């Protein structure tokens, strides 16, 4: 579903101009919540802070235990935060992260346009029919930038050739579609 027309850009001067136009309070220090004890998140947060400082944004990293992080993020008591999430290659899985009524809408989005686009894509049955909706979704997410998809881990998946019904493209850590598996005892 990757939309190659959505450019990834890095333009500190443009970012600074956009913040100035939005009357961003440069004298305010933002609190950036991260989960303690995760060295990858700590390094990523440090890099993000460096980039924000380049455009004049003051940021203080606050390491908290995971329950506190989740509570702050869910209650909207945060300026910035990093939450890892599992998922699949299907963009419809991000619906809950952006739906106004969702319990995991960490960005506190109130606009339903993005979820409406996902719902239209989900109503379609084929990849070809769904792709235009998810292309549009990626464009809108990029325009609004309420969140950033930072990285995904490389994962190697293997299974015994006796097992059939395995849908590798739908693998994630939460859903292995094991109810579709069948084991050929003859092999």
Identify the role of each PLM range.
Residues 23, 56, 77:
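Conserved functional loop/turn residues at catalytic and ligand-binding sites
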Residues 12, 66-67, 135:
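Structural motif corresponding to alpha-helix initiation and N-cap regions
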Residues 19, 25-28:
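Short, flexible coil/linker segments at domain boundaries that flank nucleotide/cofactor-interacting
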């Amino acid at each position: 579903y990757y939309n190659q027309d959505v450019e990834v850009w890095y333009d500190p001067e443009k970012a600074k101009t956009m913040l100035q136009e939005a009357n961003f309070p440069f004298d305010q220090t933002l609190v950036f919540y991260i989960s303690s004890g995760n060295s990858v998140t700590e390094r990523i947060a440090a890099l993000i802070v460096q980039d924000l400082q380049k455009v004049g944004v003051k940021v203080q990293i606050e390491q908290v235990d995971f329950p506190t992080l989740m509570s702050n993020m869910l209650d909207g008591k945060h300026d910035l935060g990093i939450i890892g999430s599992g998922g699949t290659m299907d963009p419809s899985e991000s619906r809950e992260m952006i739906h106004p009524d969702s319990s995991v809408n960490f960005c506190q989005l109130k606009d339903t346009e993005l979820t409406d686009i996902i719902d239209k894509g989900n109503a379609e049955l084929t990849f070809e029919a769904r792709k235009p909706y998810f292309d549009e979704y990626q464009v809108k997410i990029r325009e609004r930038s309420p969140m950033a998809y930072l990285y995904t881990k490389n994962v190697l998946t293997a299974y015994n050739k006796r097992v059939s019904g395995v849908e590798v493209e739908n693998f994630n850590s939460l859903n292995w579609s094991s109810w579709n598996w069948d084991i050929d005892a003859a092999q």
